[in-house]
Amino acid sequence: MLAMLRLAKPSNERDWVPDNERMAHAEFDGDEVRLRNVRDFGWRTTRDYDERWTEMSFRLSEVCKIWLVLEYFDPKHRPIAHTLISFEFEDGRRLACSIEVRRELGEVYHPLKGMLRQYELLYVWATESDVIGVRARCRRKSKTHLFEGVVLGEDSHRRLLKSFLL
């Protein structure tokens, strides 16, 4: 069993489920960032959605708030949660990052496989309406909470966003 676990090699060359299909890519020009493949799905259910991919341009210096998002999978078992982060810009736009299991077509998520590192991971960059929308509208058992983050120190918001993008 251990030998099988160690033989599993991560790859970007697989048939992925549509919402994990594209990897975001950031291009930097000083303070300016252009982020491609930002997911902006319109979710009706977890299997019925309008697929949209977009790009977003922004200045790192315009990040004014950071939001922490916690999704408790089952409120009766609160210790199990998924954490996301959302960056708010001075113009009101929000860009969220969720580190997720990158599922292949036909693959079903299981927490035990996750603990044994049997999935590839993907930084999903998305509109906040996408990543919170799917949780609020489509995942009936889960509870999602949004908390304003406190980041101490000058320039911390910008540095945190840049560290996630690199």
Residue ranges and their predicted role:
Residues 8-29:
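Alpha-helical transmembrane signal-anchor/signal-peptide segments
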Residues 33, 37-39:
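Intramembrane catalytic core of multi-pass membrane enzymes that act on lipidic substrates
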Residues 33, 44-144:
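Glycine-rich catalytic cores of cysteine/serine-nucleophile enzymes that process amide/ester linkages
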Residues 129-166:
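Active-site nucleophile-His-acid catalytic modules used for acyl/amide transfer and hydrolysis
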